[in-house]
């Protein structure tokens, strides 16, 4: 397994590219990406991880901010290039960007797996989108990881 964190460049690979889409809200969301990376360490894949070590929470979230624009564009490119997208909706967060990303990619035909535990504030919306587009939805991160290994 190879992990590529934002904003490092990436290209197509022989092994599947897996994008980790999900709650990142600092101070609220668990670092679920670390758990996925550790669990997939022995798999033949490249993980595209938007959680960056040098994240600046004070950066203005405006298109005119080059730092912010770089992050958003990296994520959009990674979502488009990914063979598999893993979504995780942490019940302690709102995750509006993750909801948007699911909406953008639900119909693409990409292999998508969603983990939306009980307690997520818009779980019903996520359930309906997954049912409509034939996307597998699970309740725990462990189930998400297990199903991801099967897809790889």
Regions found by a protein language model. Name each.
Residues 1-152:
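Conserved catalytic or regulatory cores that recognize and/or transform ribose-phosphate-containing ligands
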